[in-house]
């Protein structure tokens, strides 16, 4: 909850905490990643735990986060002029579904996206987010599955939507 507050300027509700935890847990398995190598090297050299984590996090650059940032930009471009005020309320997104075809490569998973199925299953259970429902319906419409990065983007936009609409955060906060 504190991490979401730091980014969005408001605490999430129970559902917001649930989806934030799903997003964070998507990155727990670091097997074969440069971040794990940096953390292990830092740990072996006797650094404190916070230095170990800082070293690993410092490895995560814009290039690694770019697919999720692109998905956030795509979702934002689809919904930014909509009348959607509550990201967990009721909203008819048929118009956005029809407009989303140009973002197919950004929003749908490639064959090597191993986390996508598990994450989609978790997010589909008791889905309240308009953005997550939209993403799942778009994938179904296109005969694919949403990418992990697109689901991370949908979670982030769900958490930040009210703050964005009330101008507590900017579009840049959502897309960078």
Predicted regions and their residues:
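Hydrophobic alpha-helical bundle cores within soluble ligand-binding/oligomerization subdomains
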Residues: 1-176
């Amino acid at each position: 909850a504190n991490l979401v507050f730091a980014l969005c300027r408001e605490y999430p509700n129970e559902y917001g905490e649930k989806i934030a935890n799903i997003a964070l847990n998507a990155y727990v398995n670091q097997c074969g990643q440069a971040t794990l190598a940096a953390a292990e090297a830092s740990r072996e050299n006797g650094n404190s735990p916070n230095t170990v984590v800082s070293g690993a996090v410092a490895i995560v650059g814009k290039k690694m986060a770019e697919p999720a940032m692109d998905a956030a930009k795509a979702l934002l471009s689809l919904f930014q002029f909509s009348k959607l005020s509550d990201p967990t309320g009721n909203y008819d997104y048929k118009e956005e579904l029809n407009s989303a075809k140009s973002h197919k490569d950004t929003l749908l998973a490639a064959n090597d996206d191993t986390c996508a199925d598990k994450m989609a299953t978790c997010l589909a259970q008791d889905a309240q987010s308009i953005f997550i429902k939209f993403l799942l319906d778009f994938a179904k419409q296109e005969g694919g599955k949403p990418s992990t990065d697109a689901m991370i983007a949908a979670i982030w936009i769900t958490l930040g939507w009210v703050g964005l609409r009330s101008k507590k955060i900017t579009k840049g906060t959502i897309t960078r």
